[in-house]
Design a protein with these regions (language model features):
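Conserved N-terminal alpha-helix of the aminotransferase class I/II PLP-enzyme fold
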Residues: 2-46, 194
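Short glycine-rich or small-residue beta-strand-to-loop segments that form or flank ligand, phosphate
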Residues: 11, 38-40, 124-127, 346
C-alpha cells in the first residue's frame, strides 16, 4: 500500500483529482469555509511555496513578517519577489517577538507609495497563529474553525464576512465619508485611522494549514484554503502549475486519506475537542498559579504580558483568574487587535535562574526526558 499510485488504476490522482480525492477536497472546502481546498502531502512548507509561486511574479513586492517560516523565503526566491520585511513589536523582557501591528503595515505601504512603488505590491504574508499563540484577526490554527469564539479570527471566515460587508450600502456610505475626511490628511492621520476598504475591493485570501500539527492527520498532511474572487480568471492556471511543480507524482495515499479522516472528525466532534482543549489549558494554568512552590518560580504569561495595552481595546489582561475562573473571551476576540490563543501555554522560567534553552536541555530533557517544542 505504501507504493500505491494513480497509474495502478482504481485510485484517484492528487495532481488531477476526479474521484474520491476530488470529493474529499470539496468536503474539506465546505468544512473550512473556503471556495477551493487543495491537499498536500509534504507539509505546509510546500503549501507556502505553491501559493507564493502562483501569485507572485518577478519584481513584485511582498510584505512579510520578519519572523515568518523559512519556506516563505525560499518561495519568494523562486518567484523572484522583492521583499519588504515587517517588524513585530518586541517583548524584550521575555526575549520574544509579538505580532505585526496594522500601523507597521500602513507605514511600509506609505513608504512604498512615496517611492512610486505601491502598484507593485502583490501580497501581504502573515503567520496566524504564532507559535506563542498570538492571533491576528492559520498554519497552526486549523482547529479554530470549529469554535464560535476562534472562528471569527480565521482567514476564511474573515474573507466571507468582508465580501458580504463590501456589498452593503452602509459600507459604501462609510467609505465615501471617510475618503472625504482624508482628502487633506497627513501620513500620520492615515496611520492612525481605521481605514475602510473601497466597495470595489477584491477579496483575495489564501490560508495554508498544517493539519498534521493541529488536527488529526499523518505527518506532512496539509491543506491550502483559497477564498479568492479572482482565482478562476487570474490565478487558476499558475496555481496548478505551481502545484504540479511541488507535488510528487507518487504521493502517499495514506497521508491523503488521513486528511479526509481529520476533516470528518472535526466536523463531527471538533467543537467538543476544542472546548476540552481550552479547559485542559486553563486547568494547567490554575495548577501552576495555585501551587505554592511552582508559582514562586514559574509564571504562565497572559494576554497582558504578551500584547501591549493599546492593542487590547477590551482592557482585559487575562482570560483566566485563579479565584474567579474564565473571563468573557468572546468580547476580547471581537474587539482587540491581537488576542492570545489560550491553548498555547507560554511559561516564563526566569524565576528559576535559568534561561529557556538551559532549562529545556539541562533540566527537562537530560534529567527528566521531557521534550519542549520551543524556547527563547
Amino acid at each position: 500500500l505504501a507504493e500505491t499510485s494513480a497509474t495502478s488504476g482504481g485510485l484517484d490522482s492528487l495532481l488531477e483529482p476526479h474521484g474520491p480525492i476530488k470529493e474529499a477536497q470539496e468536503l474539506a472546502s465546505r468544512a473550512f469555509g473556503s471556495k477551493q481546498t487543495f491537499f498536500a502531502t509534504n507539509g505546509t512548507s510546500t503549501c507556502n511555496k505553491i501559493v507564493v509561486q502562483a501569485l507572485v511574479r518577478p519584481g513584485d513586492i511582498v510584505l512579510v513578517d520578519r519572523d515568518c517560516h523559512k519556506s516563505h523565503h525560499y518561495g519568494m526566491v523562486l518567484a523572484g519577489a522583492e521583499v519588504v520585511y515587517l517588524d513585530s513589536y518586541p517583548l524584550n523582557e521575555y526575549s520574544m517577538y509579538g505580532a505585526v501591528p496594522l500601523r507597521e503595515i500602513k507605514h511600509q505601504l506609505l513608504a512604498l507609495k512615496a517611492a512610486g512603488k505601491l502598484d507593485r505590491v502583490r501580497m501581504l504574508l502573515l503567520t496566524n497563529c504564532t507559535f506563542d499563540g498570538l492571533v491576528y484577526n492559520e498554519a497552526w490554527f486549523a482547529f479554530a474553525r470549529f469554535s464560535p469564539t476562534y472562528r471569527q479570527r480565521t482567514a476564511m471566515r474573515t474573507a466571507n464576512d468582508l465580501r458580504k460587508r463590501l456589498r452593503t450600502e452602509d459600507h459604501a456610505r462609510a467609505y465615501k465619508a471617510q475618503q472625504k475626511e482624508l482628502e487633506t490628511a497627513s501620513d500620520e492621520d492615515w496611520l492612525d485611522a481605521r481605514l475602510i476598504a473601497p466597495p470595489a475591493a477584491r477579496v483575495r485570501v489564501y490560508a495554508t494549514q498544517s493539519t498534521h500539527k493541529t488536527l488529526t492527520s499523518l505527518r506532512q498532511g496539509s491543506m491550502i484554503h483559497v477564498n479568492d474572487q479572482d482565482f478562476k480568471g487570474e490565478v487558476e492556471q499558475s496555481f496548478h502549475e505551481a502545484y504540479m511543480t511541488h507535488t510528487s507524482t507518487s504521493p502517499n495515499y495514506q497521508i491523503i486519506a488521513s486528511l479526509d479522516v481529520g476533516r470528518r472528525q472535526v466536523e463531527l466532534e471538533g467543537f467538543e475537542f476544542v472546548q476540552r482543549q481550552i479547559e485542559a489549558a486553563m486547568s494547567m494554568r490554575r495548577a501552576i498559579a495555585s501551587h505554592p512552590l511552582l508559582k514562586k518560580y514559574f509564571k504562565v504569561l497572559a494576554a497582558g504580558d504578551m500584547i501591549p495595552e493599546h492593542h487590547r481595546q477590551s482592557g482585559v489582561s487575562s482570560y483566566f483568574d485563579v479565584e474567579q475562573g474564565w473571563t468573557d473571551m468572546f468580547e476580547c476576540w471581537e474587539q482587540d487587535d491581537f488576542v492570545l490563543d489560550p491553548t498555547r501555554v507560554t511559561l516564563a522560567v526566569g524565576g528559576t535562574g535559568w534561561d529557556g534553552d538551559t532549562f529545556k536541555n539541562d533540566v527537562l530533557m537530560d534529567k527528566y526526558g521531557i521534550q519542549i517544542n520551543k524556547t527563547s
